[in-house]
Amino acid sequence: MWRLRAVLGAAAICAIAMPLACVAAPPPPALPAETPAEFHPLETGFDYSERHVDIPMRDGVKLHAIIMIPQGAAHAPILLTRTPYNAEDLSAHRHSSHMVAMLDGYDNASDIESEDGYIRVIEDVRGKYGSQGAYIMNRPWKGPLNPTEIDHATDTYDTIDWLVHHLPQSNGRVGLLGISYDGFTTLMGLINPHPALRAAVPMNPMVDGWMGDDWFHRGAFRQINLSYIYEQEATRTNDAKWWETHYDDYDMYLAVGSAGALARSHGMEQLGFYQKLVAHPAYDSFWQDQAVDRKLAAEPLRVPTLLVHSLWDQEDIYGDIAVYKAIKPKDTDNSRVFLAMGPWHHGGEIRDGSALGQVRWGSDTALWFRQHVLRPFLDHFLKDDAPPLGLAPVTAFETGTNEWRRLPA
């Protein structure tokens, strides 16, 4: 009996003590986070300010853009690039308090853009990186290949409309420029353009993907582009990376046997654009109906345009010359369509243009182009009270003599 009482007493004590212990037990110690809930970087001494915005389109989709505004800007023109290559990256090639360093890289004539006081805007196209919506490779304009009411022309229009109404530092004039795919989006902005679009500089643009730009070169499929298509279409942010089986691509092509086999080994049947390439190996209506030069030939000439051609462009050797032939006849007084041709590879006009491989030109041809062709073109059409334009219809670098020539249309 005594033992029973002892057990019952101990149980009662435990029953009372355990809840008290649970309530009274202090929480384990924790170190406070050193990362603030929201960090506000200081930009003291920066020669620009930066905004990250999401611009609404007419269908409700929002497109992500980076806006860089020089300190003290007033009545400044806007230079816009629309890209599938990540606006965040193209606006931050380096991390710096100086705008010229931030923009020093692909798609940016950083010396002209920063020295001349332009507001720089870089926007992710629909469906890529920070932008909402569906991505379509070289999205066609509204028509047989695009039954929707949305294309690059409408997105460009809506973007420009938002910019001129939300950037009080601007003079309301916008220029489009871009290289390669971004040259393609620049040309698309010429279709039913916004009234504030006053100049366009398509550099090495994709124009006809079968005739001579990117995918086919007059019917010869460029299997080297499979890796580009894979990374561009597999994910919104290019997270899926093309993997190699050989150190040398040539050995890989020999080993795999065909472009189709190489694509299948990487699962590319899942990608919409690859399916279109397989379905349209010939120059059928699929390619003809999205050839940008054909479209622009049927459009009124509304926007002054400077086409930039690289004489040794390994990717888009066809497009800018084709567009020049299509729209130049409309420029009867030689005041709105210009062509510059330099001794560069694809995109070489924004880099050091002193040489091509081992061939040296005796000067930085790209710098000369930017200072003597690009700058006066942009100044004339975008700046307030700009000086008269003295450009020849064609400005071309002549190899051998290594001199720039001013040529008639």
Q: How would you name each of these model-derived features?
A:
Residues 7-21:
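Bacterial N-terminal signal peptides
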Residues 26-52, 56-61, 195, 276, ...:
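Alpha/beta-hydrolase-fold serine-hydrolase catalytic core, especially in secreted/extracellular enzymes
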Residues 62-63, 75-78, 116-120, 170-174, ...:
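Loop/turn elements at helix/coil->beta-strand transitions in domains of secreted/extracellular proteins
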Residues 66-126, 133-140, 322-329:
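N-terminal cap/lid subdomain of alpha/beta-hydrolase-fold enzymes
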Residues 72-73, 134-151, 158-175, 180:
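Gly/Ser-rich "nucleophile elbow"/oxyanion-hole loop immediately N-terminal to the catalytic nucleophile
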Residues 88, 95-99, 103-109, 115, ...:
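Accessory cap/linker subdomain of secreted extracellular hydrolases
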Residues 176-178, 203, 308:
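Short beta-strand immediately N-terminal to the catalytic nucleophile in serine-hydrolase-like folds
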Residues 178-188:
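Glycine-rich nucleophile elbow surrounding the catalytic serine of serine-hydrolase chemistry
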